UniProtKB/Swiss-Prot annotation:
Gene Ontology cellular-component terms listed: cytoplasm
Record-given protein name: Segregation and condensation protein B
Summary of the function given for this chain in its UniProt record: Participates in chromosomal partition during cell division. May act via the formation of a condensin-like complex containing Smc and ScpA that pull DNA away from mid-cell into both cell halves.
Source taxon at top rank: Bacteria
Quaternary context: Homodimer. Homodimerization may be required to stabilize the binding of ScpA to the Smc head domains. Component of a cohesin-like complex composed of ScpA, ScpB and the Smc homodimer, in which ScpA and ScpB bind to the head domain of Smc. The presence of the three proteins is required for the association of the complex with DNA.
Gene Ontology biological process terms in this record: cell division; chromosome separation; DNA replication
InterPro entries documented for this protein: ScpB_csome_segregation, WH-like_DNA-bd_sf, WH_DNA-bd_sf
Keywords in alphabetical order: Cell cycle, Cell division, Chromosome partition, Cytoplasm
Any matching Pfam family: SMC_ScpB
Family: Belongs to the ScpB family.
Lineage, broadest ranks: Bacteria, Bacillati, Bacillota, Bacilli, Bacillales
Organism: Bacillus licheniformis (strain ATCC 14580 / DSM 13 / JCM 2505 / CCUG 7422 / NBRC 12200 / NCIMB 9375 / NCTC 10341 / NRRL NRS-1264 / Gibson 46)
């Protein structure tokens, strides 16, 4: 490929944005961009310098050969205000994500999205901001994806002492009844939530 450095930066930015808080490993970037390691390092250095020079709210960070976009520390006070601002109740989508995480934890964003069939990154971030979910570790394998789990706040908000008090999942559902199982699952979870209001 013979794109100029500006196009490479835009492509990398799009890839890292799509990857979210899990970021992308050097190996993944090399594979997707089809460049050699020296070219990748030049591209990533240029991306990093661009974020540092310009008045941007985000920066490029690297840890354990993984790159990700992160908010700059100097804007933490504003993020804190956002997190602490009063917010409306949970949407249907947020309840679905909470249900999935509460029963399947620890679980990665990709696994949540596979179950739901739609992107769930922003919902997960919102639930973390509301202190209903938190990072409980990192998955093994490439990228070391974040594992999510519920919090004490989740238990308090739903009137639970332990996760064992969650409504039981339907048992013995055939493979082609998975969608029906999911519908029952969310219906049961939502009913429990409504009962606690």
């Amino acid at each position: 490929m013979t794109l100029d450095i500006v196009n490479w930066k835009a492509i990398v930015e799009a890839l890292l944005y799509a990857a979210g808080d899990e970021g992308l490993t050097k190996k993944q970037l090399l594979s997707v961009l089809e460049v050699d390691e020296a070219e990748l390092l030049d591209i990533m250095l240029d991306v990093k310098e661009t974020y540092e020079k310009e008045d941007r709210g985000i920066e490029l960070v690297e840890y354990a050969d993984t790159y990700m976009l992160s908010t700059k520390k100097e804007f933490a006070v504003y993020l804190k205000k956002l997190i602490e601002a009063p917010s409306k109740g949970l949407s249907q989508a947020a309840l679905e994500v909470l249900a999935i995480v509460s029963y399947k934890q620890p679980i990665t964003r990709a696994e949540v999205e596979e179950i739901r069939g739609v992107k769930s990154e922003r919902i997960l971030q919102s639930l973390v901001a509301k202190a209903l979910l938190c990072e409980v570790g990192r998955a093994d394998g490439p990228g070391r994806a974040i594992l999510y789990g519920t919090t004490e706040t989740f238990l308090e908000q739903f009137g639970l002492k332990t996760l064992e008090e969650l409504p039981p999942l339907p048992e013995n559902v055939e493979e082609d009844g998975v969608q029906e199982e999911a519908d029952l699952f969310f219906e049961n979870f939502n009913q429990t939530f409504e009962d606690l209001k």
